[in-house]
Amino acid sequence: MKNALEIVTFKIKDGVKLPDFLKASAELEEGFAKKQEGFLSRTFARREGNEWVDVIRWQTMADAEAASKAAMQSTACAPMFGMIDEPSVKMMHFEVLS
């Protein structure tokens, strides 16, 4: 089976303090992502203009899709999700070819 990449781009809401957002991101990773079946790795980055990307590698596409659904119900994800500008979110899943 091929691995899957979950790539999410977004902006954070105006007024959110960077240390608070980074703490919420760490809580999402430790309290949710790493506990999901098939989790392999996570890379979290930003660039100028308040643009962020969250890339998670999963063992399978099914693992990625299951985790995405579970995240919406997770109390560990809620603080970070609450700081994200929802209309800016773009989520994609890709099959890893190499």
Positions of PLM-derived features:
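Short, charged/polar surface micro-motifs in flexible loops or helix N-caps
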Residues: 14, 50, 60-64
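Short beta-strand-to-loop capping motifs
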Residues: 9-14, 56-58
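Small-side-chain structural scaffolding
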Residues: 4, 8, 64-67
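Glycine-rich beta-strand-turn "strand-cap" elements at beta-sheet edges
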Residues: 1-4, 10-13, 40-51, 76-98
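Short, surface-exposed ligand-recognition loops at beta-strand->loop->(often short) alpha-helix junctions
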Residues: 11-23
